[in-house]
UniProtKB/Swiss-Prot annotation:
Keywords: Cell cycle, Cell division, Cytoplasm, Cytoskeleton, Mitosis, Nucleus. GO terms for biological process: cell division; mitotic spindle pole body duplication. The keyword Nucleus applies. It is found in: Cytoplasm; Nucleus; Cytoplasm, Cytoskeleton, Spindle pole. Component of the spindle pole body (SPB) half-bridge involved in the initial steps of SPB duplication. This is Protein sfi1.
């Protein structure tokens, strides 16, 4: 495939299409055709449905063939026109616009004849033959194998040259297309850079004017702002005076409000503190009561725990003491039996055996009876004590049993664990004691064996003694283990009974409490029901009374309404009558008053005119007297006002001068700062412009160098390819020429050797014949001395060369070889199997 996406398969100057590529394009065309008929041709759901349906119709798996969906998403992402136009652009881009110019025209023809006649479909064999034709060495070997005649060879060579020229033409066209695309890209880059340079030129040309205009506008704005600022100063002074007066009034109001707020805040703080103290006192009282109850409960619980621990320790100590006394008695008894048996054995064996049997029977019975008696007594004592303890424990802890039952369970488990460990320790200590005793006895028996091993009787007696002692020891072990197991089971059963009894007591207490609560709840519900019934009866009675009151009130209201209506009508008539009488009286009074008012006003007018005349005369006289004084006073006031105004103008000029100086200083500072910033901006802009120009120049230089490098590389590649082809042809020619020369030399040498051998053999035969004939003819030499020998040509070396049969063949071969060197190379290809040269 070329860079533009089209395949580089060329046949006779035109591009051809492979069947696989045609099938892929046909599938893509079908998908785009379905998308063009869809409502939304760019939705992912429609794209996926069209993709799956078309692939399944063509026998493909959508999960495996994902290349189509990638191409579709690329086309959707770059879609700007309709799918028909996009398909037309795609076919034009890959160079097959003449195959399918529309989505409705299929790529595959309908019948096989059209497929055979289609110039854009290539079969596999033709494609392979055309791909093989691109290789010169394979093409030469195929020509050598298939073409034999000289005319066919020349015709095929001409075809190959034309095919090669066409391939070169197609490659040159592709190169020109690539070059055109490259120039197009470079032109686009040049256009962008020219646009950037033009913009920079416009900026350089019009930027100073814009800056000058901007500065003029800023100066005008600044002067207008200064004038506006002076006006604002006068307005602000007046507003400041008003604000100061308003602030004084606000301050007074604020002080009053602050005083009230301070009083209210203090009062609220006092109330809050009092409430907090009150709540603290209540909480403290509740907390002290709760703490006293808690301490009382804790003291009771602690006493109960101490009593329980003391009882458990006393019980364990008594059991341990009983077990220890039993063990001590057993050990003493064993020692006593051993000592007595040993002494009796020394006295008499038979009596000793009988005594031992009797003693064993007696001891067993006595031991069993004593142990049973002691055990019964101890059990009775323990049962009495435990009954008393249980009664005391039930009396003291019955109320707190449900609360502390879980805690006690954990303590009981720990105690059981400790008891089990203690029992194990006791068993271990008993086992170690028994082991030590057994070791001592074994040592004694070993000593006795060493003493009495000389005689059989002593050995037999010792064996009997050992057997008796072992039986006795085994019985003792069984007794001890049975006793330990019995006491252990008794303790466990006692503990189980005790726990069961505690649980039953707790359960009965909880049950009684629960039943009591249920009874109380039922009684409370009954009381509440009776109370609700009483309240309902009371409300019903009140409601009836209120209904009766409402009826009485409605009757009274109707009576009052009728009376009020009668009274209202009477009052309206009375009011209307009184109004008429009053209006007549008022009209009379108004007439009288109006006449009096007119008379009074006329009299007052006459009086006022007289008074005014008098006052005017007096005023004229007074003004004449006071005019001089007023003129002097006005002059003095005007002069004072003029002086004050001049002073105010002086102060205003000074203040304006100060303001102007400050404004000028601020303006000069801002102007200098702005000037520095503008100079820095101009410098930065010039540097940036120069940098961009340098970057553009570097990029252009690199592009030109790259273009020259590419052109040089293409030229070098073309020259290298031509030189390689020429060198390959020359190398092949030299190989064929040298092989032909070597074959000719070998052939000539073979012929030469054969001829020389043949000539040498003939010469030997003739030499032998001549010698025989010479020996025969020596006798006759004297007779025929005058006659020359007819065998003088025996040693003539020119004789073999005179044979036309051989000389003609060698001469013809040499002439033929020279003629073949002048002919084209392909004539000798049928005699050779050349090794292709290493073109690398």
């Amino acid at each position: 495939m070329s860079k533009n996406g089209a395949p580089k398969y060329v046949d006779g100057g035109r591009k051809i299409m492979d069947e696989d590529l045609r099938r892929d394009l046909e599938i893509l065309r079908l998908i785009l055709l379905r998308l063009s008929h869809a409502a939304d041709d760019t939705s992912p759901l429609d794209v996926f449905n069209a993709y799956e349906s078309v692939l399944r119709e063509n026998g493909l798996n959508p999960a495996r063939h994902r290349s189509y969906i990638r191409i579709l998403y690329r086309l959707i992402s770059s879609k700007k026109l309709s799918w028909n136009d996009e398909w037309r652009n795609l076919m034009r881009r890959i160079g097959f616009s003449q195959v399918s110019s529309d989505l409705n025209t299929p790529l595959f023809p309908l019948n096989n004849t059209d497929m055979e006649n289609d110039p854009f479909i290539v079969n596999g064999d033709d494609y392979r033959s055309r791909s093989n034709q691109q290789k010169s060495s394979q093409f030469a070997s195929e020509v050598a194998q298939t073409i034999k005649s000289q005319t066919a060879m020349f015709r095929r060579a001409d075809q190959y040259r034309s095919q090669k020229d066409k391939i070169l033409l197609a490659n040159s066209l592709d190169f020109m297309l690539e070059k055109y695309r490259y120039y197009k890209k470079i032109d686009a880059v040049y256009l962008r850079k020219a646009d950037a340079v033009y913009r920079a030129f416009i900026m350089l040309k019009y930027f100073p004017r814009w800056v000058q205009k901007l500065r003029n506008i800023q100066s005008r704005i600044y002067s207008a702002g200064e004038a506006y600022r002076l006006i604002l100063i006068g307005q602000m002074v007046n507003r400041w005076r008003q604000k100061t007066r308003e602030r004084l009034h606000q301050k007074l109001r604020f002080q009053k409000n602050a005083f009230l707020l301070d009083v209210l805040l203090k009062w609220s703080a006092l109330t809050v503190n009092w409430n907090r103290k009150h709540e603290y006192m209540l909480k403290r009282r509740v907390f002290t009561n709760w703490m006293s109850k808690r301490r009382r409960n804790e003291s009771l619980i602690q006493k109960a725990n101490v009593f329980f621990q003391h009882s458990v320790l006393a019980h364990s100590f008594k059991t341990w003491k009983a077990n220890l006394s039993i063990k001590n008695a057993a050990t003493l008894y064993e020692k006593k039996v051993v000592f007595m048996s040993f002494n009796r054995w020394h006295a008499n064996y038979e009596s000793h055996v009988l005594d031992l049997q009797k003693a064993e029977l007696f001891s067993q019975k006595a031991y069993y009876s004593i142990a049973l008696h002691k055990w019964k007594l101890r059990i009775e004592e323990l049962s009495d004590l435990m009954n008393k303890a249980d009664d005391l424990y039930e009396v003291n802890l019955l109320q707190r049993m449900l609360v502390l039952w879980r805690r006690k369970a954990t303590t009981y488990e720990k105690i059981d664990f400790w008891m089990d460990g203690h029992d194990v320790d006791i068993v271990k200590s008993a086992f170690f004691k028994w082991k030590n005793k057994f070791i001592k006895v074994d040592r004694n028996f070993e000593l006795a064996d060493t003493i009495l091993q000389n005689t059989f009787l002593t050995k037999w007696r010792l064996a009997v003694r050992v057997k008796v002692v072992q039986e006795k020891r085994n019985k003792d072990r069984l007794i001890v283990t049975f006793r330990f197991w019995y006491y252990l089971m008794k303790a466990k059963s006692f503990q189980h009974k005790r726990d069961h009894r505690l649980l039953t007591i707790a359960w009965e207490a909880w049950k009684d409490n629960y039943q009591r609560r249920i009874k109380l709840q039922k009684e409370a519900q009954e009381l509440q029901l009776t109370r609700i019934q009483k309240i309902a009866k009371q409300y019903l009675i009140k409601w009836r009374i209120s209904l009766l009151d409402i009826k009485e009130l409605s009757i009274r209201a109707e009576k009052l309404h009728t009376t009020n209506e009668i009274i209202g009508v009477w009052n309206q008539w009375v009011v209307s009558y009184n109004r008429k009488v009053g209006m007549q009286q008022n009209a009379d009074l108004f007439f009288k008053r109006k006449t009096l008012r007119v008379v009074f006003e006329h009299w007052r007018y006459l009086r006022e005119t007289n008074m005014l005349l008098r006052l005017e005369n007096k005023v004229v006289d007074f003004r004449e007297v006071q005019s001089e004084k007023l003129v002097l006073r006005c002059w003095n006031a005007w002069v004072a006002r003029l002086l004050s105004v001049s002073q105010m103008l002086d102060t205003a000029e000074l203040s304006t001068q100060k303001v102007v100086v400050r404004a000028y200083e601020a303006w000069s500072f801002r102007y200098n700062h702005q000037k520095e910033i503008m100079s820095q901006a101009d410098q930065f802009y010039n540097e940036r412009l120069m940098r961009s120009a340098m970057v553009f120049w570097r990029y252009q230089l690199r592009a030109i160098k790259f273009y020259f490098n590419i052109s040089d590389w293409k030229r070098r590649e073309f020259n290298r390819q031509t030189l390689r082809n020429a060198f390959d042809a020359w190398h092949l020619l030299m190989f064929r020429v040298t092989s032909l020369v070597m074959q000719a030399d070998r052939f000539h040498e073979q012929k030469k050797n054969k001829l020389l051998g043949k000539y040498f053999r003939k010469w030997l035969q003739r030499m032998q014949l001549n010698q025989e004939e010479s020996s025969l003819l020596e006798a006759e030499a004297t007779i025929e001395g005058n006659r020359t020998s007819r065998y003088m040509h025996t040693f003539d070396t020119t004789l073999p060369m005179q044979n036309d049969e051989f000389t003609d063949e060698s001469v013809n071969f040499e002439n033929r070889w020279k003629q073949e060197l002048k002919t084209p190379i392909s004539r000798f290809s049928k005699f050779l199997r050349p090794i292709p040269p290493n073109t690398r």
